[in-house]
């Protein structure tokens, strides 16, 4: 039928039937449940999930919309991805990263996250790279958003050190210290994009991303030598936090080119994180860290776990039990998009096989 053919056209392949099932079930859910269209205005809206059993409902963070849902949609439909990117800029680009919004852009929960403005740059660059449509930066609303995002990030730079401060983690939790590892890794990647997409005069004033990455190694590494590991947040006066954030986890650093996944400092930090995260009662835990581990040294083990995990009838849930069964906030469309794209990326970019 025409419907079946249309759905098949959206599906992706990884070379593994097992991985294909995980990718495509979650990709299609993100495609249809992470995006809505207004009955009154016919405009597109990015949401956390249209599933009525998900508590976040029709709210959205810039980071989740642009870095979780959009990459999955883009795998299946670059035309829709373009419309969604422009629409996100229209609704949220005037004040990127300010917190949780309702679908119409009204602020629901305030709290500035440095990942928000960076996400607009990274999402634009990913779209250009995948679609070869570099004319999107000529769209006035996209161009304005990139300039505003660059200004917001620049305003957060420390006076002495090329690191950038935030108020909350991308999960919404208050940052224990103003300079976060995940936030600065993301900023470094965004700065690369600004250097390529802003006009010559503005681009010349953008911080060198290499300087930010060097500062990350210098200021976030705690201990030294063979015991060195990465802190999650610091204040640049000697205080540091090792408590990882479920959304802004250090596990994601290779994706932002901050550290290679084979880097010894990264691997030690991941091992320490796994040891400390092994709580005595792991009956309920976020699914997100498991997805992030697909980028690290435990990728094969995590993939085997995902093969067995029931999730929410195969769809990502925010909270799961030790076996991967959905406990709360099932039908998480944005998280389903992240799961689909991360498994696809692990297969195509990292060579992961089931």
Annotated model-derived regions:
Residues 1-58, 354:
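Acidic/polar, glycine-enriched structural segments that form the non-catalytic walls/loops
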Residues 62, 148-151, 158-159, 176-188, ...:
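Extended ligand-binding clefts on enzyme/binding-domain cores
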Residues 26-38, 76-99, 129, 141-162, ...:
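Long, well-ordered core segments of solenoidal/helical folds
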Residues 56-159, 184, 330-353:
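Aromatic-rich carbohydrate-recognition surfaces in CAZymes
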Residues 57-60, 110-127, 240-260, 282-354:
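C-terminal capping/lid segments that line or modulate ligand- or cofactor-binding pockets
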Residues 46-54, 95-112, 163-179, 236, ...:
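Acidic/His metal-coordination segments adjacent to aromatic residues that form catalytic metal sites
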């Amino acid at each position: 039928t025409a419907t079946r053919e249309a759905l098949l056209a959206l599906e992706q392949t990884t070379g593994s039937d097992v991985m294909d099932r995980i990718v495509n079930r979650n990709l299609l859910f993100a495609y249809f449940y992470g995006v809505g269209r207004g009955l009154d205005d016919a405009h597109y809206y990015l949401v956390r999930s249209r599933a009525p059993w998900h508590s976040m409902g029709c709210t959205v963070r810039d980071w989740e919309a642009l870095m979780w849902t959009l990459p999955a949609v883009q795998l299946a439909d670059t035309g829709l991805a373009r419309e969604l990117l422009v629409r996100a800029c229209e609704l949220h680009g005037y004040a990127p990263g300010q917190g949780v919004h309702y679908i119409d852009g009204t602020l629901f929960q305030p709290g500035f996250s440095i990942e928000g403005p960076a996400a607009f740059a990274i999402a634009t660059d990913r779209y250009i790279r995948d679609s070869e449509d570099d004319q999107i930066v000529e769209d006035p609303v996209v161009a304005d958003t990139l300039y505003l995002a660059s200004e917001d990030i620049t305003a957060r730079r420390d006076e002495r050190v090329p690191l950038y401060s935030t108020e909350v983690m991308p999960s919404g939790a208050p940052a224990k210290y103003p300079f976060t590892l995940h936030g600065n890794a993301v900023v470094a990647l965004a700065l690369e994009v600004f250097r390529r997409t802003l006009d010559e005069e503005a681009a010349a004033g953008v911080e060198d991303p290499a300087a930010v990455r060097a500062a990350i190694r210098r200021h976030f590494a705690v201990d030294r030598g063979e015991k060195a590991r990465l802190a999650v947040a610091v204040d640049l006066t000697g205080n540091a936090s090792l408590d990882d954030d479920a959304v802004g986890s250090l596990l994601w650093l290779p994706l932002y080119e901050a550290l290679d996944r084979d880097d010894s400092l990264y691997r030690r930090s991941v091992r320490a994180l796994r040891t400390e995260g092994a709580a005595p009662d792991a009956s309920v835990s976020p699914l997100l860290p498991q997805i992030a581990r697909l980028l690290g040294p435990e990728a094969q083990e995590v993939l085997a776990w995902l093969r067995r995990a029931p999730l929410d009838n195969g769809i990502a849930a925010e909270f799961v039990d030790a076996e991967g069964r959905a406990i709360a906030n099932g039908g998480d469309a944005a998280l389903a998009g992240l799961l689909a794209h991360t498994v696809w990326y692990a297969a195509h970019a990292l060579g992961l096989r089931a």
